[in-house]
């Protein structure tokens, strides 16, 4: 009787459970084209921008758009509101162009 079960036991011991490997993935909340479009819209609609056609992904706030540092802070705050995130002051100080804002948003997984 034991021999009858021994063949089944060998089969059962040969079967190993399948454990899926964890593969880390990085998910971005906002795709770059969507982030670019939304940021361009936010910056273009800012009151102190006199020519919205000058707003491009390569525009700098101070040189190309004529914004002072307080205006740049207001633009960053508008971007925070648009994407429902809080940008730390240290990071906000480094956002000096539309391109910087786009890069920051696409790298931030909390952006919506």
From Swiss-Prot:
Mod. after translation: 4'-phosphopantetheine is transferred from CoA to a specific serine of apo-ACP by acpS. This modification is essential for activity because fatty acids are bound in thioester linkage to the sulfhydryl of the prosthetic group.
Location in or out of the cell: Mitochondrion
Residues of the Carrier domain: 33-109
Family annotation (Pfam families): PP-binding (PF00550)
GO biological process, one term: fatty acid biosynthetic process
Xref: InterPro entries: ACP, ACP-like_sf, PP-bd_ACP, Ppantetheine_attach_site
Pathway field: Lipid metabolism; fatty acid biosynthesis
Superkingdom of origin: Eukaryota
Swiss-Prot/TrEMBL keywords: Electron transport, Fatty acid biosynthesis, Fatty acid metabolism, Lipid biosynthesis, Lipid metabolism, Mitochondrion, Phosphopantetheine, Phosphoprotein, Transit peptide, Transport
Gene Ontology MF terms: acyl binding; acyl carrier activity
Transit peptide start and end: 1-28
GO cellular component: mitochondrial [2Fe-2S] assembly complex; mitochondrial matrix; mitochondrion
Modified residues (O-(pantetheine 4'-phosphoryl)serine): 69
Stated role: Carrier of the growing fatty acid chain in fatty acid biosynthesis. May be involved in the synthesis of very-long-chain fatty acids.
Annotated NCBIfam families: acyl_carrier (TIGR00517), PRK00982.1-2 (NF002148)
Recorded family membership: Belongs to the acyl carrier protein (ACP) family.
Protein name as it appears in the record: Putative acyl carrier protein, mitochondrial
Native source species: Schizosaccharomyces pombe (strain 972 / ATCC 24843) (Fission yeast)
Organism classification: Eukaryota, Fungi, Dikarya, Ascomycota, Taphrinomycotina
